[in-house]
A protein has these predicted regions:
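Adenylate-forming
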Residues: 41, 202-203
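Catalytic core of soluble alpha/beta enzymes
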Residues: 67, 72-198, 202
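N-terminal capping/lid subdomain adjacent to the active-site entrance of alpha/beta enzymes
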Residues: 1-89, 93-102, 106-110
Length: 203
């Protein structure tokens, strides 16, 4: 899918250049002046480091901050550093079983998280994600590992997520990404695009 995505992205780039327009305008974003961004931090597994990096991100003007922590102590440290006014997301990178995720998310409800991302392994276990979502007060996000709009449709049909995160370099390129956006609207799921940090994303 990386290769297909790369070819599709290149074709869209050709269309934009032939039109003498930025690709964002070709895709219909004319008039949009600002796009909200969040600070995506490393995994530190150290409370003081988390506090320091969260405070730095806040001072730089970020109004949303994403952690990559899996331990409660670091999530608590982030909330202590940021207060209640800054939304916090946690990307866990598929570390737990369904039962482990259920238990941990239950203990994290006190932190008023914006979402928890990919809490279980394998990430395409949409049935387990749906079960966790139905029992948790914390919204769930997933999708960076999903390929094609067909897989996202299965995700939405399972009611597995609140936020879908297609990666343009994995899902099949811009064409398939747009299909995911269209399908997500039918199911009332919000799209939060994943950053394409490898594969064709290096280009």
């Amino acid at each position: 899918m990386f290769a297909i995505s790369g070819v599709d992205i290149a074709l869209w780039d050709i269309v934009a250049k032939n039109s003498n327009l930025p690709l964002c305008n070709v895709l219909g974003s004319a008039g949009i002046k600002k796009i909200p961004a969040y600070a995506s931090l490393w995994r530190y597994e150290n409370k003081e480091a988390v506090k320091d990096r969260c405070s730095s991100a806040k001072n730089l003007g970020y109004n949303y901050i994403k952690l990559h922590e899996v331990f409660t102590s670091e999530v608590r440290a982030a909330r202590e550093a940021l207060g209640e006014e800054i939304p916090v997301m946690v990307d866990t990178n598929c570390p737990w079983t369904k039962d482990e995720a259920r238990q941990i998310l239950n203990s994290w409800e006190e932190f008023n998280l914006y979402w928890v991302e990919e809490p279980i392994n394998p990430p395409e276990d949409f049935e387990s994600l749906s079960n966790i979502r139905s029992e948790s007060l914390i919204p769930l996000a997933a999708g960076e590992n999903a390929c094609t709009s067909f897989e996202f449709k299965k995700m939405f049909e399972s009611e597995a997520v609140d936020y879908a995160q297609p990666s343009v370099t994995k899902v099949g390129g811009i064409t398939e990404f747009n299909k995911v956006v269209s399908i997500s609207q039918s199911y009332g799921v919000q799209v939060m695009p994943h950053s394409p940090y490898f594969g064709p994303g290096f280009l």
